[in-house]
Protein backbone atom coordinates (compact mmCIF):
# COMPACT_ATOMS: atom_id res chain seq x y z
CA UNK A 1 0.00 0.00 0.00
CA UNK A 2 1.12 3.52 -0.69
CA UNK A 3 1.72 6.23 1.87
CA UNK A 4 -1.36 8.09 0.60
CA UNK A 5 -3.55 5.04 1.25
CA UNK A 6 -2.88 5.10 5.00
CA UNK A 7 -3.36 8.84 5.22
CA UNK A 8 -6.59 8.70 3.19
CA UNK A 9 -7.91 5.87 5.37
CA UNK A 10 -7.35 7.95 8.49
CA UNK A 11 -8.67 11.21 7.02
CA UNK A 12 -11.84 9.65 5.57
CA UNK A 13 -12.70 7.91 8.82
CA UNK A 14 -11.96 11.03 10.88
CA UNK A 15 -13.95 13.26 8.50
CA UNK A 16 -16.96 10.97 8.89
CA UNK A 17 -16.69 11.29 12.68
CA UNK A 18 -16.47 15.09 12.50
CA UNK A 19 -19.41 15.29 10.09
CA UNK A 20 -21.51 13.09 12.39
CA UNK A 21 -20.55 15.31 15.33
CA UNK A 22 -21.63 18.48 13.52
CA UNK A 23 -24.98 16.92 12.65
CA UNK A 24 -25.50 15.80 16.26
CA UNK A 25 -24.66 19.25 17.62
CA UNK A 26 -27.30 20.89 15.41
CA UNK A 27 -29.90 18.80 17.23
CA UNK A 28 -29.02 20.39 20.57
CA UNK A 29 -31.32 23.31 21.23
CA UNK A 30 -29.80 26.68 21.92
CA UNK A 31 -31.57 29.92 22.77
CA UNK A 32 -32.17 30.68 19.11
CA UNK A 33 -34.30 28.83 16.57
CA UNK A 34 -32.36 26.67 14.16
CA UNK A 35 -34.14 25.11 11.17
CA UNK A 36 -31.56 22.29 11.17
CA UNK A 37 -33.42 20.84 14.14
CA UNK A 38 -35.94 19.58 11.56
CA UNK A 39 -33.37 18.05 9.17
CA UNK A 40 -34.01 14.47 10.30
CA UNK A 41 -37.77 14.87 10.34
CA UNK A 42 -39.46 12.54 7.85
CA UNK A 43 -43.10 13.31 7.00
CA UNK A 44 -45.56 10.71 5.74
CA UNK A 45 -46.82 12.27 2.51
CA UNK A 46 -47.96 11.01 -0.86
CA UNK A 47 -47.58 7.42 0.34
CA UNK A 48 -43.94 7.73 1.40
CA UNK A 49 -41.70 9.31 4.02
CA UNK A 50 -40.18 12.57 2.81
CA UNK A 51 -37.85 15.13 4.42
CA UNK A 52 -39.52 18.32 5.62
CA UNK A 53 -37.49 20.51 3.24
CA UNK A 54 -38.99 18.74 0.24
CA UNK A 55 -42.52 19.48 1.49
CA UNK A 56 -42.27 22.97 2.94
CA UNK A 57 -40.36 26.23 3.14
CA UNK A 58 -38.76 26.69 6.56
CA UNK A 59 -37.88 30.25 7.64
CA UNK A 60 -36.78 31.91 10.86
CA UNK A 61 -38.99 34.63 12.29
CA UNK A 62 -36.80 36.33 14.95
CA UNK A 63 -36.38 36.23 17.84
CA UNK A 64 -37.58 32.68 18.66
CA UNK A 65 -39.96 31.41 16.01
CA UNK A 66 -39.78 29.29 12.87
CA UNK A 67 -42.46 29.46 10.19
CA UNK A 68 -43.13 26.36 8.11
CA UNK A 69 -45.11 26.95 4.91
CA UNK A 70 -46.08 23.67 3.20
CA UNK A 71 -45.94 23.78 -0.59
CA UNK A 72 -49.24 21.85 -0.60
CA UNK A 73 -50.99 23.08 2.57
CA UNK A 74 -54.14 21.01 2.16
CA UNK A 75 -52.24 17.73 1.94
CA UNK A 76 -49.28 18.28 4.25
CA UNK A 77 -50.03 20.77 7.03
CA UNK A 78 -51.53 18.24 9.45
CA UNK A 79 -48.90 15.60 8.67
CA UNK A 80 -46.06 18.08 9.32
CA UNK A 81 -47.74 19.32 12.51
CA UNK A 82 -48.19 15.76 13.81
CA UNK A 83 -44.62 14.74 13.02
CA UNK A 84 -43.16 17.80 14.79
CA UNK A 85 -45.18 16.91 17.90
CA UNK A 86 -44.14 13.26 17.67
CA UNK A 87 -40.44 14.20 17.26
CA UNK A 88 -40.29 15.36 20.89
CA UNK A 89 -37.78 18.16 20.24
CA UNK A 90 -39.03 20.49 22.95
CA UNK A 91 -41.16 22.79 20.81
CA UNK A 92 -44.89 23.18 20.36
CA UNK A 93 -46.14 23.75 16.80
CA UNK A 94 -49.31 25.76 16.13
CA UNK A 95 -51.27 25.62 12.88
CA UNK A 96 -51.98 29.17 11.70
CA UNK A 97 -54.03 28.98 8.51
CA UNK A 98 -51.83 27.46 5.82
CA UNK A 99 -48.61 27.67 7.82
CA UNK A 100 -47.22 26.23 11.01
CA UNK A 101 -45.63 28.42 13.66
CA UNK A 102 -43.06 26.78 15.90
CA UNK A 103 -42.09 28.79 18.97
CA UNK A 104 -38.81 28.03 20.66
CA UNK A 105 -39.18 28.77 24.36
CA UNK A 106 -36.36 30.51 26.19
CA UNK A 107 -34.17 27.80 27.67
CA UNK A 108 -33.17 28.02 31.31
CA UNK A 109 -29.63 28.35 32.62
CA UNK A 110 -29.96 24.84 34.04
CA UNK A 111 -30.87 23.47 30.61
CA UNK A 112 -27.99 25.35 29.03
CA UNK A 113 -25.55 23.77 31.50
CA UNK A 114 -27.05 20.31 30.90
CA UNK A 115 -26.65 20.85 27.16
CA UNK A 116 -23.01 21.86 27.65
CA UNK A 117 -22.42 18.62 29.56
CA UNK A 118 -24.09 16.73 26.72
CA UNK A 119 -21.84 18.49 24.18
CA UNK A 120 -18.74 17.55 26.19
CA UNK A 121 -19.92 13.94 26.36
CA UNK A 122 -20.46 13.75 22.58
CA UNK A 123 -17.08 15.39 21.89
CA UNK A 124 -15.33 12.96 24.25
CA UNK A 125 -17.00 10.11 22.36
CA UNK A 126 -15.55 11.46 19.11
CA UNK A 127 -12.09 11.80 20.70
CA UNK A 128 -12.29 8.12 21.68
CA UNK A 129 -13.45 7.10 18.21
CA UNK A 130 -10.60 9.08 16.63
CA UNK A 131 -8.13 7.28 18.89
CA UNK A 132 -9.52 3.95 17.64
CA UNK A 133 -9.21 5.08 14.01
CA UNK A 134 -5.65 6.29 14.63
CA UNK A 135 -4.77 2.99 16.31
CA UNK A 136 -6.24 1.06 13.36
CA UNK A 137 -4.23 3.12 10.87
CA UNK A 138 -1.03 2.62 12.88
CA UNK A 139 -1.67 -1.14 13.09
CA UNK A 140 -2.19 -1.28 9.32
CA UNK A 141 1.17 0.43 8.84
CA UNK A 142 2.94 -1.93 11.23
CA UNK A 143 1.26 -5.02 9.73
CA UNK A 144 2.40 -4.18 6.20
CA UNK A 145 6.10 -4.42 7.21
CA UNK A 146 7.46 -1.23 5.71
CA UNK A 147 11.03 -0.15 6.27
CA UNK A 148 11.58 1.71 9.51
CA UNK A 149 12.02 5.16 7.93
CA UNK A 150 8.75 4.93 5.99
CA UNK A 151 6.93 3.54 9.02
CA UNK A 152 8.16 6.41 11.22
CA UNK A 153 7.30 8.94 8.53
CA UNK A 154 3.74 7.56 8.24
CA UNK A 155 3.28 7.51 12.00
CA UNK A 156 4.47 11.12 12.27
CA UNK A 157 2.12 12.19 9.47
CA UNK A 158 -0.86 10.47 11.11
CA UNK A 159 -0.01 12.04 14.48
CA UNK A 160 0.18 15.47 12.84
CA UNK A 161 -3.21 14.99 11.16
CA UNK A 162 -4.66 13.64 14.41
CA UNK A 163 -3.48 16.79 16.22
CA UNK A 164 -5.29 18.90 13.59
CA UNK A 165 -8.51 16.95 14.18
CA UNK A 166 -8.11 17.36 17.94
CA UNK A 167 -7.73 21.12 17.48
CA UNK A 168 -10.80 21.12 15.25
CA UNK A 169 -12.78 19.30 17.97
CA UNK A 170 -11.67 21.87 20.55
CA UNK A 171 -12.87 24.71 18.30
CA UNK A 172 -16.21 22.99 17.64
CA UNK A 173 -16.69 22.52 21.39
CA UNK A 174 -15.81 26.15 22.20
CA UNK A 175 -18.16 27.45 19.49
CA UNK A 176 -21.08 25.29 20.63
CA UNK A 177 -20.56 26.20 24.29
CA UNK A 178 -20.45 29.89 23.37
CA UNK A 179 -23.65 29.47 21.35
CA UNK A 180 -25.34 27.68 24.26
CA UNK A 181 -24.36 30.36 26.77
CA UNK A 182 -25.48 33.25 24.54
CA UNK A 183 -28.84 34.55 25.72
UniProtKB/Swiss-Prot annotation:
Short name of any one Pfam family annotated for the protein: RRF
Gene3D superfamilies reported for this sequence: 3.30.1360.40, Ribosome-recycling factor
Top-level taxonomic group: Bacteria
Matches recorded under InterPro entries: Ribosome_recyc_fac, Ribosome_recyc_fac_dom, RRF_sf
Principal localisation: cytoplasm
Similarity section: Belongs to the RRF family.
Role noted for this protein: Responsible for the release of ribosomes from messenger RNA at the termination of protein biosynthesis. May increase the efficiency of translation by recycling ribosomes from one round of translation to another.
Record-given protein name: Ribosome-recycling factor
GN (gene name): frr
Amino acid sequence: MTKAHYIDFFKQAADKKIQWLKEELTKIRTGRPNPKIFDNLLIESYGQKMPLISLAQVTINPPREIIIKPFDPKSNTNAIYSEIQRANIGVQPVIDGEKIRVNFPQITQETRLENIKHVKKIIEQIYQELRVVRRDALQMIKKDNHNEDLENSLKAEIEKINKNYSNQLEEIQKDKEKELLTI
